[in-house]
């Protein structure tokens, strides 16, 4: 799914080790918001394993991005369901000045 919005906050960074593979991982959470009349907000994670995704995406607070998100439902040990929203790609969106016939600033 695509979501276009501004990163309004970077949340916590968590690290750990996969008990099965022994591979270290890192996760950074972000909050993004659309610029609509009634803004929509989403919290999502960027996971970093061997691919260096966190550094590659280099998301910055205050910048506008087109985010490519995966949604997955999981069940915890108590049997309750929850959603996991992860970004697998992001592209910075150019700012358009509509007063200049749609030319980029």
What are these regions (language model features)?
Residues 1-105:
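Single-stranded nucleic acid-binding surfaces, predominantly the OB-fold ssDNA-binding core
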